[in-house]
């Protein structure tokens, strides 16, 4: 399916930020649509010649296949990537970048997918935005009923990645984590998404840090931030910062994330870019860096 066709299926999958709490709103971006669409073909213009960045242990990207994906991964300095699936969806990882599998939703909990995930290491990401009707759309109790199958893989498990409100008492993640504790289920780390609608660099970095800190204080478990960027999904259509604003946020947020001892990994949303998706993508077809991509490549590591 094309990204445009899949965009309708992903309507309302995003959020914007008020203070440090992401709030749901309509996500219409083609980038977000790829979480359901899978690999996206693209034309192949001339490529740039920027040197590859040194891979950072925490730095990662959310990705789907496109022309130049392998080269873009290498140039970005990402040490890991995921595709919202149990397998890499045709992306060939360059040296220094490892694929991390995900079990996306209830329909993904199959013997074949679990076996595929086990072939890709010892870490498994849980369900994608189960609190959103347009994403995996699972109640906490439904997710808990499936969790033993993920646990049986013996892999390190990331919690379901809620779209918003991970720090809220009585929220989706809070109910899931309490249920897991009562049942004696294993959750090794918390997985989060965050999108900011305040495009001022310092304010956005503060909001993201505040959200992460609140989630850490609630669960006291390591955190993986597996989607983040500046995008106001509360606007219709979605509102994006300028390239320079997005690039400034990439630089400042990465520096902040690298200083958080409980933040084990982070993944920018997303590796690919096209003309209809605002300023969030890092690389255009052919591995040509955007302003955000150049900033991500140069962002300091530990």
Q: Which stretches of residues belong to each language-model region?
A:
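Secretory targeting and sorting signals
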Residues: 1-20
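Aromatic-rich peripheral "rim/lid" segments of glycoside hydrolase catalytic domains that contact
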Residues: 8, 16, 91-93, 98-105, ...
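N-terminal low-complexity, Pro/Thr-rich disordered segments
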Residues: 15-57, 302
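N-terminal carbohydrate-binding/catalytic regions of secreted carbohydrate-active enzymes
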Residues: 55-125, 131-141
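Structural recognition of the beta-strand scaffold that forms the well-ordered cores
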Residues: 58-63, 79-84, 98-103, 122-127, ...
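Alpha-helical scaffolding within the catalytic cores
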Residues: 66-68, 81-90, 105-117, 141-145, ...
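Aromatic- and acid-rich polysaccharide-binding/catalytic face
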Residues: 83, 128, 173-214, 218-235, ...
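Active-site clefts of carbohydrate-active enzymes
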Residues: 158-162, 166, 219-248, 269-284
């Amino acid at each position: 399916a094309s990204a445009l066709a899949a965009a309708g299926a992903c309507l309302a999958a995003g959020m914007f930020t008020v203070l440090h709490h992401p709030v749901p709103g309509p996500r219409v971006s083609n980038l977000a649509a790829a979480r359901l669409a899978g690999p996206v073909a693209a034309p192949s213009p001339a490529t740039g010649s920027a040197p590859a960045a040194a891979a950072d242990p925490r730095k990662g990207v959310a990705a789907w296949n496109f022309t130049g994906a392998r080269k873009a991964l290498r140039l970005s300095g990402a040490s890991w990537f995921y595709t919202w699936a149990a397998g890499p969806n045709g992306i060939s990882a360059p040296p220094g970048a490892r694929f991390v599998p995900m079990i996306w939703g209830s329909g993904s909990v199959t013997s074949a997918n679990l076996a595929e995930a086990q072939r890709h290491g010892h870490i498994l990401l849980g369900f994608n935005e189960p609190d959103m009707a347009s994403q995996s759309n699972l109640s906490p109790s439904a997710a808990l009923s499936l969790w033993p199958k993920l646990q049986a893989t013996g892999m390190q498990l990331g919690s379901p990645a809620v779209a918003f409100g991970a720090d809220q008492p009585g929220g989706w993640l809070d109910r899931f984590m309490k249920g897991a504790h009562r049942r004696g289920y294993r959750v090794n780390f918390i997985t989060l998404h965050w999108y900011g609608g305040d495009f001022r660099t310092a304010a956005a970095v503060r909001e993201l840090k505040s959200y992460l800190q609140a989630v850490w204080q609630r669960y006291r478990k390591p955190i993986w931030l597996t989607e983040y960027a500046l995008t106001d999904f509360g606007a219709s259509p979605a509102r994006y910062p300028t390239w320079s604003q997005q690039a400034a946020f990439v630089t400042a947020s990465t520096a902040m994330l690298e200083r958080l001892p409980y933040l084990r990994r982070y993944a920018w949303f997303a590796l690919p870019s096209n003309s209809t998706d605002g300023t969030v993508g890092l690389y255009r077809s052919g591995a040509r860096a955007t302003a955000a991509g150049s900033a991500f490549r140069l962002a300091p590591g530990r």
